[in-house]
Regions:
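Tubulin/FtsZ superfamily GTPase core signature
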Residues: 1-360
Length: 360
């Protein structure tokens, strides 16, 4: 995400216990946590060590976050630092700094074992208590929806595309003037204390591109349930100068028809000439009934039940995976509003969110 260069006007800050991982990061600022407890090493896939490291470095974390209006925390759940430190960072961001705090995390693959899955679920529950909005993406869906001939790298790029577009859609809404402008207050209205949320992205070009992209966004195979009944929806329609009012209306109608009748719907459009004939649509839906927060679209007996197959973007269309490992980041948006994005990285590959892995 750091090397892609697609998120403009931001400052990335890497956070980790592992000094070696920080050295390999291309982030503008690198923050080592838990020096006394970990001696510059990783957390050994132990969430307690990750939590202790963050607690030890509370003041340092608070210092780098101070002044931010919005904080994104991204982590791979199930390991040590990501699972243990993320809730502490979230608590600091929301309660001490007063920032709108959004977490985007991944759940481990089945092959990573029961222990990591249990640790992931426990970490997610703790994280949920300290954020305004929590978006969970199950890595297992990558295996379920990928075509047989697609490589592992292509699958990771698809997930990277989802995460990258999700973060970019929010930052673009705030920082890039569009046909329909949205500011930070609009984003905050949808995402403050929203609880569990869903994120979907879609893209298309050619005839009926708006309809196809909108349908893809609201039925993304990486989503565990539909956006039906959401009481808060934030979506961004991005395209070049040939984006028409009719296309905006078509896409908006598809997205909003599934929402709660009284939903707070915030949308904006951004002009990006680099898209050419392509339209990209990102949707974040929140404010579901409590009984839907435990994803009803997945069997309780099999939390990774294979969803209906839906075409994913071709590898050439997704955001490039950075060449170098990116342990973590914090994003500060330039201009009137400052937005921090923290991605907590850990010491081994399986701890790194699938969308951030670069070596397999």
């Amino acid at each position: 995400m750091i090397n892609s260069g697609k998120i403009k006007g931001v400052e990335f800050i890497a956070v980790n216990t592992d000094m070696q991982a920080l050295i390999n990061s291309n982030a503008d600022i690198k923050l080592q946590i838990g020096e006394k407890g970990t001696k510059g090493l990783g957390s050994g896939s132990n969430p307690e060590i990750g939590q202790q490291a963050a607690e030890e470095s509370r003041e340092k974390i608070k210092e780098v976050l101070m002044g931010a209006d919005m904080v994104f925390i991204t982590a791979g759940e199930g390991g040590g630092t990501g699972t243990g430190a993320a809730p502490v960072i979230a608590e600091i961001a929301k309660k001490d700094v007063g920032a709108l705090t959004v977490a985007v995390v991944t759940k481990p693959f089945l092959f990573e074992g029961a222990r990591r899955r249990v640790q992931a679920e426990e970490g997610i529950e703790k994280l949920k208590e300290n954020v305004d909005t929590l978006i969970v993406i199950p890595n297992q869906r990558l295996m379920d929806v990928a075509k047989k001939e697609q490589t592992l790298l292509d699958a990771f790029k698809m997930a990277d595309s989802v995460l990258g577009q999700g973060v970019q859609s929010i930052s673009d809404l705030i920082t890039i003037p569009g046909l329909v402008n949205v500011d930070f207050a609009d984003v905050k209205a949808v995402m403050t204390n929203a609880g569990s949320a869903l994120m979907g992205v879609g893209k298309s070009s050619g005839e009926k591109r708006a309809i196809i992209a909108a349908n893809a966004a609201v039925s993304s195979p990486l989503l565990e349930i539909s956006i039906e009944g959401a009481r808060g929806i934030l979506f961004n329609i991005a395209g070049s100068k040939n984006l028409t009012l009719t296309e905006i209306n078509e896409a908006s109608s598809i997205i909003t028809q599934s929402a709660d009748p009284d939903a707070n719907i915030i949308f904006g459009t951004t002009i990006r000439e680099d898209l050419g004939d392509e339209i990209q649509i990102s949707v974040i839906a929140a404010g579901f009934d409590e009984n839907r927060r435990h994803f009803s679209g997945v069997s309780a007996a099999n939390p990774y039940l294979k969803p209906q197959s839906i075409p994913l973007p071709e590898p050439s269309q997704v955001i490039e995976t950075p060449e170098d490992p990116q342990p973590s980041a914090q994003v500060k948006l330039a201009g009137k509003y400052k937005v921090h994005h923290n991605e907590v990285d850990i010491e081994d590959d399986l701890d790194i969110p699938a969308f951030l892995r670069n070596k397999y």
